Amino acid sequence: MSGLLSSLSSAAQSMDAQRYGMDVTGQNIANLNTEGYVRRRLELAERQIVAGVGGVEVVGVRATRDQFVDQRMRTELPAESRDSAMSSALAVIETSLGSTGQSIDGALSNLFKAFSNLSSDPQSAVSRDGVVLQGTRVAVAFNEMAQRLDDSAHQADNDMRASVEQINTLTKSIAKLNQQIGDAPTNADIAPLKDKLDIALQNLSKITNIGVIMHPNGTADVAVASGHPLVVGKFSYDLNITNAPVTGVAEVRTSDGTDITATLDSGSLGGQRAVRDTLVPGYQQQLDQLAYDFATAVNTVSQSGFDLNGNTGPLLYLPLATVQGAAAQLKFNPALATNTSLIAASSTGAPGDNGTARALAALQNQDKARGNTATFVESWSELVNKVGTDSANARDSLATRHEVVSAIQGLRDSVSGVSLDEEAGKLLQFQRAYEANAKYFSTINSTLDVLMAALGGL
């Protein structure tokens, strides 16, 4: 009798275990498309036979997580996000430069054509109006291009400020999850909390490079690349934004006031800083140098000539004090717009002479830019090519990084992801085991009924 009762108990426990397995499998299938979900696995063990009772016992439910793969993902994501931020910003800058012949190069060509027309008829009011019109358009083209580059730097600065806010939001979330995990009862299911923690850490690593220390209880401590803590246990430490004294751009400081801006070289925050502090300033310097070289060359020739009244030629462009900011400050002399007779076309002062107009037109093909090694259009093309090359390199690097991240994600999915085929097989396995144990239970129960009936008849 006791043996049958033991078998009945063993069958019931096994049925419970198989039903639990079906529940776990169903949970996996339900979360097939849930971001950050890690596949659960039911762990069973043989129950030691004691007093004739054996069978199976549920050890627990384990999340199939590989900490090494998770760490590798957090290592690669910052580089991918950095390239993504740079690629996006450079695509905008590349577009803002305009197409060949429709930007600064086109404006310069039209001005030199106006100088050529003036040389054909130095006293023509129409030709002089053409110089004013095209000269003004060149200045406007430089001004607008300088503004576009400044807008790109300003956008990158705003993006940095937003990224710091996102970092602070995520670190607060991580600290809260640490507290929930640490306060959870010993046998509580904290797998969902760990999933949320992993998502938060992954999202944080997209913004900036972080160091993560995982503790045995499942909590995580986080620090930025400089070593300054962001999360320690249930406490989070905000990054703060201050404005640089001269430029007013964002500086990133830790909770103790340390400026870590220069160390932010990875993640989307690192890409935004590279755009703001390195790429755009480099383009601005090239553009400013071109504007300065152009204005200097044109003004020098103009001042060597004479206007219609026989007076020394004027500045075609208002004087520029320094190279820095030249593109934004370039302005056609407004006095010439109100009195075109002041435009110098003659090199001798004699009526009908066109020496200065010809000299101005000839500047188009002279190496007066980039330290007298390139023409103005060639210098502009060099800037366009530089932006194009940087943009292409960022795209290529992003593609390479994406392949690496995709490969790691594939490895991660093979370990932690949910496979419908695999789960369907497990579901069938648990179902059949349940049915077999149910049949075993029914058989033992029937045998007991027969035995009890027999004993009752004695």
Range-by-range predicted roles:
Residues 1-458:
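S/T-rich, low-complexity, solvent-exposed segments of bacterial secretion/appendage proteins
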